[in-house]
A protein has these predicted regions:
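A short, basic/flexible loop-to-alpha-helix module at the beginning of a structural domain
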Residues: 1-6, 164
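N-terminal Rossmann-like FAD-binding beta1-loop-alpha1 element of flavoenzymes
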Residues: 4-34
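Short amphipathic alpha-helical segments
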Residues: 21-23, 46-47, 148-152
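A generic structural signal for alpha->beta connector loops
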Residues: 29-31, 100, 158-159
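Carboxylate/His-rich catalytic cores and anion/metal-binding grooves
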Residues: 34-43, 132-140
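Glycine-rich active-site loop/strand segments that organize a redox cofactor
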Residues: 39, 46-89
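Glycine-rich dinucleotide-binding loop and its adjacent helix/turn
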Residues: 69-76, 82, 86, 140-164
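Feature captures the FAD/FMN-dependent oxidoreductase FAD-binding
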Residues: 76-144
């Protein structure tokens, strides 16, 4: 199976992944690809669309600062924006800078192995694709995988217990 090669691959198309794509592609002129597990961009804002989901950071701070143009053009409707407006903002930025041209949706990376002999990363996806890159950035966010702590004695505890 042939490997698709890029200078850099970014895993995740949320806030950080989109920012990395812009900086690496537009500023450093690297050949980049974002691999996103979901069917749309936005990261946590793509996955979490429940009623009332919103940002707990003020909108003026929850903004990209790499472009004064974006900062001036986009107007948030609320001090603490909801998930739909945040997704709309991310799509606006993505469209403005043609970021979607370098994003591959519905692509889950299942392994990333560093090839020391060739000084490169080899990535495999759930769709049986193989990618190769010199630089790998994991922009999967801190809430993409459940992390249940191993608490001594928890299995013997008979009461209710919760983890968030």
């Amino acid at each position: 199976m042939s490997k698709i090669s890029y200078d850099a691959i970014i895993i995740g198309a949320g806030f950080s992944g989109l920012y990395q794509l812009y900086k690496l592609r537009d500023n450093l002129k690297l050949n980049c690809r974002v691999l996103e597990k979901g069917s749309g961009i936005g990261g946590t804002w793509y996955w979490n669309r429940y009623p009332g989901a919103r940002c707990d950071t003020e909108s003026h701070a929850y903004t990209y600062f790499f472009s004064e143009e974006i900062f001036k053009e986009w107007e948030w409707s609320e001090r603490y924006p909801g998930h739909a407006e945040i997704r709309k903002y991310l799509n606006y930025v993505s469209n403005k800078y043609s970021l979607k041209d370098d994003i591959q949706l519905d692509t889950e990376v299942i392994s990333a192995t560093f090839d020391e002999e060739n000084n490169s990363w080899i990535l495999k996806t759930k769709n049986d694709e193989i990618f190769k890159c010199k630089f790998l950035i994991t922009a999967v966010g801190c809430i993409s995988t459940t992390n249940i702590p191993n608490i001594k004695g928890l299995k013997k505890f008979n009461g209710d217990h919760y983890h968030t």
